[in-house]
Amino acid sequence: MGGYKGIKADGGKVDQAKQLAAKTAKDIEACQKQTQQLAEYIEGSDWEGQFANKVKDVLLIMAKFQEELVQPIADHQKAIDNLSQNLAKYDTLSIKQGLDRVNP
């Protein structure tokens, strides 16, 4: 389990967060597509009536909500990627090296 000197961050946990964020993004997109397809299927089916309309409406609301999660999840992935890249560079920063000389 690699860490980053001077920062309480576990490299393995950061990598795990990157993997989980990517999986979450993929799963949300797949779920949104399936929800949308189910709503469209119900709309085109012979199932009619107030209950069918309510089910379709709920599915459309869910699909819209899932669609609205795509951008925040993408932003989250980008933040984790940036964190990972910046943590890897931390020990090479001149200010960090200067602090190490002052406070070994």
Curated annotation (Swiss-Prot):
Q: Name one GO cellular component term.
A: extracellular region
InterPro entries to which the protein is assigned, alphabetical: ESAT-6-like_sf, T7SS_ESAT-6-like
Q: Which family does it belong to?
A: Belongs to the WXG100 family.
Function per UniProt: Virulence factor that is important for the establishment of infection in the host. EsxB is required for EsxA synthesis as well as secretion. Mediates together with EsxA the release of S.aureus from the host cell. Also inhibits host cytokine production and thus modulates dendritic cell-mediated immunity.
- Tagged with keyword Secreted: yes
Major localisation: secreted
**Would you say which domain of life the source belongs to?**
Bacteria
Could you tell me what this protein is called? Type VII secretion system extracellular protein B
Name the UniProt key words of this record, in alphabetical order: Secreted, Virulence
- Record the organism: Staphylococcus aureus (strain MSSA476)
What Pfam families does this protein map onto?
WXG100
**Compartments where found:** Secreted
How is this protein organized at the quaternary level?
A: Homodimer. When mixed with EsxA does not form heterodimers.
